[in-house]
Design a protein with these regions (language model features):
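Short acidic, hydrophobic short linear motifs in intrinsically disordered regions
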Residues: 35-49
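Short alpha-helical segments that sit at the start of domains
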Residues: 1-37
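Minor-groove-contacting beta-hairpin "wing" of winged helix-turn-helix DNA-binding domains
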Residues: 79-86
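Short acidic, glycine/proline-enriched loop segments that cap or flank alpha-helices
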Residues: 52-56, 90-92
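Short amphipathic alpha-helical interaction segments
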Residues: 54-70
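Short, amphipathic alpha-helical interaction segments positioned at domain boundaries
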Residues: 87-109
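A short, conserved structural fragment
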Residues: 69-79
């Protein structure tokens, strides 16, 4: 699913990493915990499960997590990562919130 940087441009690769981390690690973790925030340990446990199941390098997912913070989909405060407040209704409904929906909600003023 994830390609090396040489196969795609820098921006396409970053977007793909963000999409993967959001869809496979972060959003399922949020729904599993039924909470707007998670710790680094919780993220790492979920990431390790997904990476071993899908045979993905952990480095790809760490870049995706940082990228989600840069896009302000995830916010980091001390040792907690939390989702943007506009995504909380999706969590409460246990709705599917793909990356496109998340980025759209965050960018709405």
């Amino acid at each position: 699913m994830l390609l090396m940087l040489s196969d795609k441009g820098k921006y396409a690769s970053a977007t793909e990493n963000r999409r993967f981390v959001w869809a496979e690690v972060v959003w399922p973790l949020i729904l599993e915990l039924n909470d707007v925030a998670f710790t680094l340990k919780q993220y790492q446990k979920k990431r390790d499960e997904v990476c071993s199941k899908k045979n993905i390098d952990i480095a790809m997912t760490s870049r995706g997590l940082v990228s989600l913070m840069q896009k302000e989909i995830l916010l980091k405060e001390d040792h907690l990562y939390s989702i943007h407040f506009r995504l909380i209704p999706y969590m409460r409904l246990k709705a599917n919130c793909d990356y496109a929906t998340a980025i759209h909600e965050v960018r709405i003023k």
